[in-house]
A protein has these predicted regions:
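Short aromatic-glycine-(Arg/Gly/Cys) micro-motifs in beta-strand/loop hairpins
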Residues: 1-20, 43
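GIY-YIG-like beta-to-alpha core
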Residues: 24-30
Length: 52
């Protein structure tokens, strides 16, 4: 079954290479709160369809 989620993408590029983590949230407000709490690297939020 597929559902839509607000996904927080957190990207860090450093001397060790490239790292990306994705956290899926059911609400945009929660995704924005998580994105604001991340201090290192770049973040962006996107609405995506995920298999559950």
């Amino acid at each position: 079954m597929k559902r839509m989620f607000w996904c927080v993408h957190h990207i860090i590029i450093d001397s060790d290479g490239y790292y990306e983590s994705i956290k899926a949230c059911s609400s945009k407000e929660t995704a924005e709160k998580i994105a604001r709490s991340i201090s290192k690297g770049e973040t962006f939020i996107r609405l995506e369809e995920k298999e559950i």
